[in-house]
């Protein structure tokens, strides 16, 4: 089968229902895949853009937890598919479609409850994706590899520090790339044979032939001992009784020559902040400026960013920073920061190593250092954060690495107490 034909007969099924509780208050109002990232996009845009850039125009998104923000984003920004060419992006909320009163019970169950819908798509291959990671990957390479090896499942994988592997599925392979063992989120991850400090971790990306996966899902649904999860149940079953192959991410990672392999789980406040600060570097690890592999998203119709005032201590300026459209930097010093769409800052304020989500207002004389500010926050005049950790911890959430998360609810409680 030709490669072009492979992508035309394939779809992606994106699992986008998880809260992402490690992001703390950032996911109080929205599901993790809907969290803004990179100045104007959402986290889910990376998985969807990878599919689109790989030539796959059949997409289904399973949603569950606080999905309104995500659904609104998809409806506004991902409506360019042509139904007459059998292109689509379908949103599949948990809706008890199997006749039971249960919502999605696990990652595999999210597909099981939509078996009839996937049947109607008439595809040969299904790529299961997590909707909450930041990376650029050509799924076509992995899909072709899956077909050529005759695997029952192909699992995307990459090398991670062993002590961080407790959050992932961890596998071992033989010299052919066949997976010989698979442990989901082990307390003591096994090391790679040639590197005691590293482990081979699953990316949560799986390629199946639909007919094979369908049979597996039907059997799993009848298993009362199953948690109905790909990592805990289905993948170990195939490793033991079938042919599971590992696909090394470095073979399909989209990057410039000599650039590092980039894949981030921005699932903590620290990781979220660090990924954004990296974007302000001279040569960031993640290239958002690659016209050959664009990150598609919904773009508001807003004017360009504007910088106002040029006086001592009242100069609208941004150094080593990303400033999105619709921002007004009025007499504010911005350094090593990422400002999302529609941020307005006022005179004598300072933003240093700050990640400021959309539609935030920063009032005069505020000083914010090493912070993440949630969307729609109004920062009061004279607020100082990032200089006194003890004081910050009284009102805001301070992470293990000293990043302070600020939300409107936190500011309201602070104002009421003073």
Curated annotation (Swiss-Prot):
One BP term from GO: glycogen biosynthetic process
Q: Which residues does alpha-D-glucose 1-phosphate bind?
A: 104, 169, 184-185, 202
List the InterPro entries hit by this protein, alphabetically: ADP-Glc_PPase, ADP_Glu_pyroP_CS, GlgC_bac, GlmU/GlgC-like_hexapep, NTP_transferase_dom, Nucleotide-diphossugar_trans, Trimer_LpxA-like_sf
Pfam family of the protein (one)? Hexapep_GlmU
Kindly report, in one word, the top-level EC class recorded for this enzyme: transferase
GO MF annotation terms: ATP binding; glucose-1-phosphate adenylyltransferase activity
Q: Which UniProt keywords apply?
A: ATP-binding, Carbohydrate metabolism, Glycogen biosynthesis, Glycogen metabolism, Nucleotide-binding, Nucleotidyltransferase, Transferase
Q: What is its EC number?
A: 2.7.7.27
Q: Which reaction does it catalyse?
A: alpha-D-glucose 1-phosphate + ATP + H(+) = ADP-alpha-D-glucose + diphosphate
| UniProt-listed Gene3D superfamilies | Hexapeptide repeat proteins, Spore Coat Polysaccharide Biosynthesis Protein SpsA, Chain A
Q: In which pathway does it act?
A: Glycan biosynthesis; glycogen biosynthesis
**Family to which this protein belongs:** Belongs to the bacterial/plant glucose-1-phosphate adenylyltransferase family.
Q: Subunit arrangement?
A: Homotetramer.
Function statement: Involved in the biosynthesis of ADP-glucose, a building block required for the elongation reactions to produce glycogen. Catalyzes the reaction between ATP and alpha-D-glucose 1-phosphate (G1P) to produce pyrophosphate and ADP-Glc.
Q: What is this protein called?
A: Glucose-1-phosphate adenylyltransferase
């Amino acid at each position: 089968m030709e490669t072009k034909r492979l992508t035309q007969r394939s779809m992606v099924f994106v699992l986008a229902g998880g809260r992402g509780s490690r992001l703390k208050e950032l996911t109080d109002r929205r599901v993790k895949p809907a969290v803004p990232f990179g100045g104007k996009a959402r986290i889910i845009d990376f998985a969807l853009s990878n599919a689109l850039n790989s030539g796959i125009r059949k997409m289904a998104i399973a949603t569950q937890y606080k999905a309104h923000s995500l659904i609104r984003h998809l409806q506004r920004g991902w409506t360019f598919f042509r139904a007459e060419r059998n292109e689509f992006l379908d949103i599949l909320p948990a809706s008890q479609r199997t006749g039971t009163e249960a919502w999605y019970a696990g990652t595999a169950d999210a597909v099981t409850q939509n078996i009839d819908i996937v049947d109607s798509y008439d595809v040969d291959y299904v790529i299961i994706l997590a909707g909450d990671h930041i990376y650029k990957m050509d799924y076509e390479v992995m899909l072709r590899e899956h077909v050529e090896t005759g695997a029952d499942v192909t699992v995307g994988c990459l090398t991670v520090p062993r002590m961080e592997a407790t959050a992932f599925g961890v596998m071992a392979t033989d010299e052919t790339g066949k997976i010989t063992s698979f442990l989901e989120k082990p307390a003591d991850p096994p090391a790679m044979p040639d590197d005691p400090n590293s482990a081979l971790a699953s990316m949560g990306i799986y390629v199946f032939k639909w007919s094979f996966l369908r049979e597996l899902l039907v059997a799993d649904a009848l298993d009362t001992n199953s948690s109905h999860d790909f990592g805990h149940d289905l993948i170990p079953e195939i490793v033991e009784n079938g042919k599971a192959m590992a696909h090394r991410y470095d073979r399909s990672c989209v990057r410039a020559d000599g650039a590092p392999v980039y894949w981030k789980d921005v699932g903590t406040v620290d990781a979220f902040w660090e990924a954004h600060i990296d974007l302000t570097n001279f040569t960031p690890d993640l290239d958002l400026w690659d016209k050959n592999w664009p990150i598609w998203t919904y773009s508001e119709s807003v004017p360009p960013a504007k910088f106002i005032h040029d006086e001592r201590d009242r100069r609208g300026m941004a150094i080593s920073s990303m400033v999105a459209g619709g921002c007004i930097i009025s007499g504010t010093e911005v350094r090593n920061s990422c400002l999302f769409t529609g941020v307005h800052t006022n005179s004598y304020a300072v933003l240093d190593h700050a990640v400021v989500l959309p539609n935030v207002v920063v009032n005069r004389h505020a000083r914010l250092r090493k912070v993440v500010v949630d969307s729609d926050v109004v920062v009061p005049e004279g607020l100082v954060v990032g200089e006194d950790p003890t004081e910050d911890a009284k009102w805001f959430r301070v992470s293990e690495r000293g990043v302070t998360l600020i939300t409107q609810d936190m500011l309201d409680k602070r104002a009421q107490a003073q």
